[in-house]
Amino acid sequence: MNLHEYQAKSLFAEYGLPVSEGFACDTAQEAVEAAGHIGGDMWVVKCQVHAGGRGKAGGVKVTSSKDEIRAFAENWLGKNLVTYQTDAKGQPVAKILVESCTDIANELYLGAVVDRSTRRVVFMASTEGGVDIETVAEHTPELIHTAIIDPLTGPQAYQARDLGFKLGLNPTQMKQFTKIFMGLANMFNDHDFALLEINPLVITTEGNLHCLDGKIGIDGNALFRQPKIKAMHDPSQDDAREAHAAKFELNYVALDGNVGCMVNGAGLAMGTMDIVNLHGGKPANFLDVGGGATKERVAEAFKIILSDSNVKAVLVNIFGGIVRCDMIAEGIIGAVKEVGVKVPVVVRLEGTNAELGREVLAKSGLDIIAATSLTDAAEQVVKAAEGK
């Protein structure tokens, strides 16, 4: 689960981190009133969506009048913002963040992730702030400095000082950086973060550190013990099909191809997508129905897959380990009849009662193509999607 920038900054403020005074507004009038409350003669207005690249897409603007703020809010509220991190539809803008302006002398980067290789929370800092950290990692990895947090001892001030020296901070800034580092590390642990970024962490013209942006990703598996964070969830930013699938405990991710995929097991699902690509096809989705693939869940999975108008054929790839393939076959038949599937369906069954499952499909009288292997399944579904 992701948080909006204004939500991230509210958490930063709770931990004593320096952030701009700002207000998240639902209407243009609220945005104008927020500017009056903040004071000054320049403000920054930002569209609140779960995506980066807002500035390049016109979703961030420095304004010098309340008329500009009103025009910006009226232009964006209720519309979708398309960036390089969204799909072609973009993300809906329901709130505008109005903030005071900050005079910037230098931009830094500070972030943290759960690193699977070290099995630790790892902080990353760089002098190359304001740009994608992935670009820095690819071209100048030596400019990224790290600190690994030991879960037994927690964050240590010396780690902050070490990063601060590498960033070239002066003694006053070092104290500020240490406070920011310790606050973020404690926040990361307290609220079960999966990702945290301040990009940029700026040095103002007065020489102080300031959190100019904020990005937070939460470990979804920990939301049961984070009621406050869970309440911050904005369902408007979720893909509607993915949200619907989650209600039926289906793991679905929409893609941009034309071959629908229904598989039991995440690893097998990724392998299925790979082999479809290998044979010239493009998967329309990732969908893992899990170990308990009942008729009801299979039917719902078909509905979700076919809600994508780009889908021209469906590949069902099931390995019968926990579940029997003959039961899965009956579920597929029932689902196809219930949903009224109009596109070709290719089914590959392996494992417990696989042969019996194929017989059930063959006797169904439905236009279901039974594949003999994974390679055969991929070849058949790609041909079917191409209308061959």
UniProtKB/Swiss-Prot annotation:
It comes from the Bacteria. GO terms for cellular component: cytosol; succinate-CoA ligase complex. GO terms for molecular function: ATP binding; magnesium ion binding; succinate-CoA ligase (ADP-forming) activity; succinate-CoA ligase (GDP-forming) activity. One of its GO terms (biological process) is tricarboxylic acid cycle. SUPFAM superfamilies: Glutathione synthetase ATP-binding domain-like, Succinyl-CoA synthetase domains. ATP binds at residues 46, 53-55, 99, 102, 107. Succinyl-CoA synthetase functions in the citric acid cycle (TCA), coupling the hydrolysis of succinyl-CoA to the synthesis of either ATP or GTP and thus represents the only step of substrate-level phosphorylation in the TCA. The beta subunit provides nucleotide specificity of the enzyme and binds the substrate succinate, while the binding sites for coenzyme A and phosphate are found in the alpha subunit. PANTHER family: SUCCINATE--COA LIGASE [GDP-FORMING] SUBUNIT BETA, MITOCHONDRIAL, SUCCINYL-COA SYNTHETASE BETA CHAIN. This is Succinate--CoA ligase [ADP-forming] subunit beta. The lineage of its organism: Bacteria, Pseudomonadati, Pseudomonadota, Gammaproteobacteria, Alteromonadales.
